[in-house]
Each structure stands twice: as C-alpha cells, then as structure tokens.
Amino acid sequence: MKHVTTDLCDANEPRLADGTLRVMAPVFRAFGKQQAFAGPAATLKIFEDNSLVREALESPGQGRVLVVDGGGSLRCALVGGNLGLLAEKNGWVGIIVNGCVRDTGELDVCDIGIRALAAHPQKSQKRGAGERDVAVQMPGAVVRPGNWIYVDADGVLVSEEKLGA
C-alpha cells in the first residue's frame, strides 16, 4: 500500500502542529525507479566522504530508508550506481542525501527510491569519517534513527512514529 504525503499531512494536522510530523524542504531531485517509498530511518552524518554510506548499505536494509546528512555539499557525490545496486540488493527501500549523487543513468534503473540535492560527476573521499545512528539535520527537518520516512512526488515527510494509511 502506497502512502500519499498529501493525505498523510491532511490526516495528521495535529502532528504537524506539534512537530511529531515534519516536512522536509522541497529541495530534492528524484532518482531511482521508485518514486514513492516509506520506511524507518537509518542515519549517517558525513561530509564529502561516503565510506560510511557503503558500510551502511552493505548491511541488511530490512525495508529501511538511509538518510544521509552530507552537509549539503555540492562538491562531490556521496552515492553512485554501485551503491544504488548495493542498496537494492540488500533490501533498502530508499536513500535520501543532503548532498549529491552521480551515475544518474545507473541510479534510475535501481529498484529503490533516491532523493538528492543534485548530480555531480566527482566521487567523494574515502577516509572513513562520520557518524552513524545519530540525529541529523536535513533541509527543513531533523531525522532521528527509527523515525518513519514517507516520500512521493509531492515531498518528504518525517514522523516520530509509523502512520496509518
């Protein structure tokens, strides 16, 4: 069953008012075959180094969404075609990147949903720097591990708990 972000907002106005349901800023471009996806969040806080992205995506996704706070950097890509395929293979439903992706043609055939600020041809560094499973500041909303993420063509929602259809 698909969750529609507009319907979720309309049905949960008290949660929007008290901040237990948040809307990310409308700054993301869509990549990947899945235009709508939902699941609990796993989080990363990194900057121009995607080592932890690979490490996370090598683990079983179990229907989760990987939320990557890349600091909004537009100087390199944090996710590319190989990582998109890895995410699909390991059961992740989506990736949201506060940063860039590359290999967009490859990403667009991956059977997951991806949101990112832009595309950039340069790869990131590989130093192993960053934090995993921490609260991250995404554009317009804080995301904590285990928050529920709902994504479709109208936007990205962050909920403190799983919402009904």
From Swiss-Prot:
<dbReference type="InterPro" id="IPR010203">
    <property type="entry name" value="RraA"/>
</dbReference>
<dbReference type="GO" id="GO:0008948">
    <property type="term" value="F:oxaloacetate decarboxylase activity"/>
</dbReference>
<dbReference type="InterPro" id="IPR036704">
    <property type="entry name" value="RraA/RraA-like_sf"/>
</dbReference>
<feature type="binding site">
    <location>
        <position position="103"/>
    </location>
    <ligand>
        <name>a divalent metal cation</name>
    </ligand>
</feature>
<keyword id="KW-0479">Metal-binding</keyword>
<dbReference type="GO" id="GO:0051252">
    <property type="term" value="P:regulation of RNA metabolic process"/>
</dbReference>
<comment type="similarity">
    <text>Belongs to the class II aldolase/RraA-like family.</text>
</comment>
<dbReference type="InterPro" id="IPR005493">
    <property type="entry name" value="RraA/RraA-like"/>
</dbReference>
<dbReference type="GO" id="GO:0046872">
    <property type="term" value="F:metal ion binding"/>
</dbReference>
<keyword id="KW-0456">Lyase</keyword>
<dbReference type="Pfam" id="PF03737">
    <property type="entry name" value="RraA-like"/>
</dbReference>
<protein>
    <recommendedName>
        <fullName>Putative 4-hydroxy-4-methyl-2-oxoglutarate aldolase</fullName>
        <ecNumber>4.1.3.17</ecNumber>
        <ecNumber>4.1.1.112</ecNumber>
    </recommendedName>
</protein>
<dbReference type="GO" id="GO:0047443">
    <property type="term" value="F:4-hydroxy-4-methyl-2-oxoglutarate aldolase activity"/>
</dbReference>
<feature type="binding site">
    <location>
        <position position="102"/>
    </location>
    <ligand>
        <name>substrate</name>
    </ligand>
</feature>
<comment type="subunit">
    <text>Homotrimer.</text>
</comment>
<dbReference type="GO" id="GO:0008428">
    <property type="term" value="F:ribonuclease inhibitor activity"/>
</dbReference>
<feature type="binding site">
    <location>
        <begin position="80"/>
        <end position="83"/>
    </location>
    <ligand>
        <name>substrate</name>
    </ligand>
</feature>
<comment type="function">
    <text>Catalyzes the aldol cleavage of 4-hydroxy-4-methyl-2-oxoglutarate (HMG) into 2 molecules of pyruvate. Also contains a secondary oxaloacetate (OAA) decarboxylase activity due to the common pyruvate enolate transition state formed following C-C bond cleavage in the retro-aldol and decarboxylation reactions.</text>
</comment>
